[in-house]
Amino acid sequence: MLYTLSRSPWQVDIHALLRLVRSGDDILLMQNGVVAALHDSRYVAVLLASPARVVALENDVEARGLVAQISSSIDTISYTEFVNLTVKHASQMAW
């Protein structure tokens, strides 16, 4: 399953999302969701402890001027790689 988080982590229940995540899933942080990947964010450790791979959409990180502040443990991906994730996963859940 591909989970997309497009809202600020302060506006969604990330713990509810993480209860659904299984090994082999991917979590894509996009739009305001990229704030969850800030290296000093209380959410980044919680996300990285999940069994899913966590990535952030590079264009959204850049658009918010956060490139230098994103955790080095979070990979950034292009739109092409985002499309590849949608092909990889038959199901997607937006948060």
Curated annotation (Swiss-Prot):
Cysteines paired by S-S bonds: none
Subcellular location: Cytoplasm
InterPro entries from the UniProt entry: DsrEFH-like, Sulphur_relay_TusB, Sulphur_relay_TusB/DsrH
Domain of life: Bacteria
GO CC terms: sulfurtransferase complex
Keyword entries, A-Z: Cytoplasm, tRNA processing
A biological process term (GO) from this entry: tRNA wobble position uridine thiolation
SUPFAM superfamilies linked: DsrEFH-like (SSF75169)
Chain's role: Part of a sulfur-relay system required for 2-thiolation of 5-methylaminomethyl-2-thiouridine (mnm(5)s(2)U) at tRNA wobble positions.
Family classification: Belongs to the DsrH/TusB family.
Subunit annotation: Heterohexamer, formed by a dimer of trimers. The hexameric TusBCD complex contains 2 copies each of TusB, TusC and TusD. The TusBCD complex interacts with TusE.
Protein name: Protein TusB
Lineage: Bacteria, Pseudomonadati, Pseudomonadota, Gammaproteobacteria, Enterobacterales
